[in-house]
Amino acid sequence: MPPTLLLSQDLPSLNYTTPGDRLDGRWRESLSTLLGLGRAAGADFVEFFLEKVNYVSCLAEDDAITSLTPRLSSGCGVRVYKGKGDCYVSTNDISFNGLRTALEKGLSILGLTLPAGQSFVPELNLEMLRDYAGAKEKDQWLHRCSPMQEMSDILLGANQKLDHYASHAQSRRAAYFRDWQEVLVAASDGTFARDIRLTQSVGFSLFCADGEHRTSIGKRSGDTSNPDYLRTWDAETSAQEVAESAGKMLYADYVESGNYPIIMANQFGGVIFHEACGHLLETTQIEHKTTPFLDKKGEKIAHENLTAWDEGLTDNAFGTIDMDDEGMPTQRTLLIENGILKNFIADRTGSIRTGHPRTGSGRRQSYAYAAASRMRNTYIAPGNYSVDDIFNSVEKGIYCKQMGGGSVGATGEFNFAVSEAYLVENGKLTKPLKGATLIGTATEIMNKISMSSQDLGLAAGFCGSVSGSVYVTVGQPHIKVDGITVGGR
């Protein structure tokens, strides 16, 4: 029987990395028995996703720490398939009896029952444990992260730097979180895999005001494999960049609404491709028939100069994973090549229901969610143009340096605020602009991305969908969109 987790009241010092608490090969016998019970009951497929989390967030507002929040959780999600139907049950009781009860509930939802108590049920054979955590010595990561006092000191020092560089600052916020997650996946196809993930993010948010003039600028970065990440954060440079952007936007003119060619900066500019197109290439959308690309595989859906990828392999990128939450090794997935749709993003359920092959993209926020097809590191590939080539091609347009929030409809209609923009005239930046909103549809914008530079950049992001919020990377080089509706004044 697997070990029982005992929670300490001393949250700051608690960790799950002592040998007796790990999710590892010692769970094989219990999970093999449970999987055998599920198959004997008539299920076509059964999966257990076990998880332990040690999370902490820290917020500094101006010159005080206003929030320091540790959170611990553990639990398991049980998924049962019968034909193309499935159900999902989660529990925070990870004892053998707790997992058996969750399995029994899942089976009953599909009209199945566990074998009688005296029945002989053979254990299901699991593969040798694929231990991504052990292979990369991830078991030591949590011990090496910044303790809470160090988090607080670094963020307060960062806010002082921001105060030094910013003018007319009304609110300075520095925020950090560390999310340590251990997962173990066992399934009736023999899958038996373990991993530890360490996700960290830190950044600034600055609000400035001078009379009637207002502006808000934020900047975050993230990492997935460096326990020393917070210690090595370049708060000085980040503070300078945020303060400089805020200073330019504070007195910027409002943009005039109209249709313009736009140049989008690299890195976080890729959020529009992620939101307006990437989600439409997830098999979840195919299942619900809410994507305009439903039957377009092999057809042209974008400008011939556009190639795009989704992958989980780039070192330290925010969406990088060694395996997905269904135990499948990650990989590179070519989405679009020279404008032609090549592949969709698929999890197990999406593959069963749509026929598209799995891509190592089954992801979830936690054990409370069933995995679904989700993006990882998604970006437009570098092109053959220089940044100067792109700017020189624009007689009058808008340069979108930083993107803000936005919304996307089920079939790809979007609007996104631009938090830092500039007027482009004859290939040159002439003045800062504020109040710009980009409005369009996925099918429209994809065919108007006519130029891509060679300076691919990636940025950390957070993506919400049916399986909760997951960590992702968005990215692109500088790109030109030949024309798009820009809302303004």
Curated annotation (Swiss-Prot):
The highest taxon in the source lineage is: Bacteria
Broad EC category? hydrolase
Q: Which InterPro entries match?
A: Metalloprtase-TldD/E_C, Metalloprtase-TldD/E_cen_dom, Metalloprtase-TldD/E_N, Peptidase_U62_metallo, TldD/PmbA_N, TldD/PmbA_sf
Signal sequence, renumbered to the chain: none
Which controlled-vocabulary keywords does the entry list? Hydrolase, Metalloprotease, Protease
Coiled-coil residues are none
| EC number per UniProt | 3.4.-.-
As one GO molecular function, the record gives: metallopeptidase activity
Task: Check the record and name the Pfam families matching this protein.
Answer: PmbA_TldD_1st, PmbA_TldD_2nd, PmbA_TldD_3rd
Q: Which GO terms describe its cellular component?
A: cytosol
The cysteines joined by S-S bonds are none
Biological process according to GO: proteolysis
- Function (record text): Probable metalloprotease.
Q: Which family is this sequence assigned to?
A: Belongs to the peptidase U62 family.
Which PANTHER family has this protein been placed in?
METALLOPROTEASE TLDD, UNCHARACTERIZED PROTEIN TLDD AND PMBA
Q: What name does this protein carry?
A: Metalloprotease slr1322
Query: What organism, scientifically named, is this protein from?
Result: Synechocystis sp. (strain ATCC 27184 / PCC 6803 / Kazusa)
Upper lineage: Bacteria, Bacillati, Cyanobacteriota, Cyanophyceae, Synechococcales
